[in-house]
UniProtKB/Swiss-Prot annotation:
Protein name: tRNA pseudouridine synthase A
Residues annotated to bind substrate: Y111
Keywords (A to Z) from UniProt: Isomerase, tRNA processing
Positions of disulphide bridges: none
C-alpha cells in the first residue's frame, strides 16, 4: 500500500528538511523512526517522495510525504510519533494510489511569513503584492539552484496585521529557492518606504534589470500546507493534534518568559 502523511515540525533545530550527512535534519529523524518501527526498509525501496524541501530554520504545519509500505497498520500518526522527537509530529494519513507523487501532483503550496514590529505601511504592501500575482519571471527573487525555469505563478498574497505582528500568506503552484523569503524582503522594503512599486515592477523583469536582495530570516517562515485538490481523503488523528497543541502551548509560555528575561538583560541608562 502507498501511504501519504501530513507532517509538522519546528525547524529551528534542523538544518532543513532534506537529509544531509553529518547534520540534523527532519528527514534524518523521520527515516530513523520509519525504519525502527519497521514501516519501511529504506526511503529508496519505499519510493519515498516529499512535497518539497524546506531550508534550515523553516517550519512546517502541512508538509506532505508519501511512501510504499507492507505494514500500513503501523503507518499512522500516533505510532510514527512514538519514534519522533517532540519537534516533529505526524497528524494525518491517507491511502493513495501507487503512482501518487507528493511533489509533482501538488496543485498549490501555501506559505506564511510572520514579521514582528511596527512602522510598516500595510496599504502600500498590499498594493505592491498585487503586482506579484499571476505568472512572472522570479529570477530576482531566487537563489540559483540549477532550475531550468524561474517562471512561477502566484495565486494569492494576503498581508494582514495582528497586533504588532504582520502576517504574509503566499500561495502558488511551486516556488524557487528562497523565493518566498525574498518576496517578504521586497514587500517589507516597500512597507518601510525604502523602495516603491516601480522598483518592484523592474524586479519582475530580470532580462533588463538585475538586483540581488537578501532573503528574510528563515525563522519567520512556515509551510502551511500543500493542496492536491480532491485527490486525497485525509484521516486526521485527533489525539496527535491535541498532544502537539498541548506541547506547543507549553513552548509558548516558555518563550514568553524568555522574552521577559531578555528584556531584563537589555542595558538601560
Amino acid at each position: 500500500m502507498r501511504v501519504a502523511l501530513k507532517l509538522a515540525y519546528i525547524g529551528t533545530e534542523f538544518h532543513g528538511s532534506q537529509i544531509q550527512p553529518s547534520v540534523e535534519t527532519v528527514e534524518k529523524e523521520l527515516f530513523k523512526a520509519l525504519r525502527n518501527l519497521r514501516i519501511i526498509e529504506s526511503p529508496k525501496s519505499a519510493n519515498y517522495i516529499c512535497a518539497g524541501r524546506t531550508d534550515a530554520g523553516v517550519h512546517a504545519l502541512g508538509q506532505v510525504i508519501a511512501f510504499d509500505t507492507d505494514r500500513p497498520n503501523l503507518a499512522i500518526p500516533r505510532i510514527i510519533n512514538s519514534g519522533l522527537p517532540p519537534t516533529i509530529w505526524v497528524w494525518a494519513h491517507a491511502e493513495v494510489p501507487y503512482d501518487f507523487d507528493a511533489r509533482r501532483h501538488a496543485v498549490s503550496r501555501h506559505y506564511r511569513y510572520v514579521i514582528s514590529g511596527e512602522g510598516y505601511d500595510i496599504s502600500k504592501m498590499r498594493e505592491a503584492s498585487k503586482l506579484l500575482l499571476g505568472t512572472h519571471d522570479f529570477e530576482n527573487f531566487s537563489r540559483s539552484n540549477g532550475e531550468k525555469s524561474t517562471v512561477r505563478t502566484l495565486e494569492r498574497i494576503n498581508v494582514r496585521v495582528d497586533g504588532d505582528i504582520t502576517k504574509i500568506d503566499v500561495v502558488g503552484n511551486s516556488f524557487l529557492w528562497n523565493m518566498v523569503r525574498k518576496i517578504v524582503t521586497a514587500l517589507s522594503m516597500i512597507g518601510k518606504g525604502v523602495r516603491d512599486n516601480d522598483w518592484l515592477i523592474q524586479m519582475l523583469n530580470p532580462d533588463i534589470y538585475e538586483e540581488g536582495i537578501e532573503p528574510a530570516p528563515a525563522y519567520g517562515l512556515t509551510l502551511m500546507g500543500v493542496n492536491y485538490g480532491e485527490e486525497i481523503n485525509w484521516i486526521e488523528d485527533n489525539y496527535s493534534i491535541r498532544r502537539a497543541s498541548d506541547q506547543n502551548s507549553k513552548r509558548i509560555l516558555r518563550y514568553r518568559v524568555m522574552a521577559e528575561v531578555l528584556e531584563e538583560l537589555i542595558y538601560h541608562e
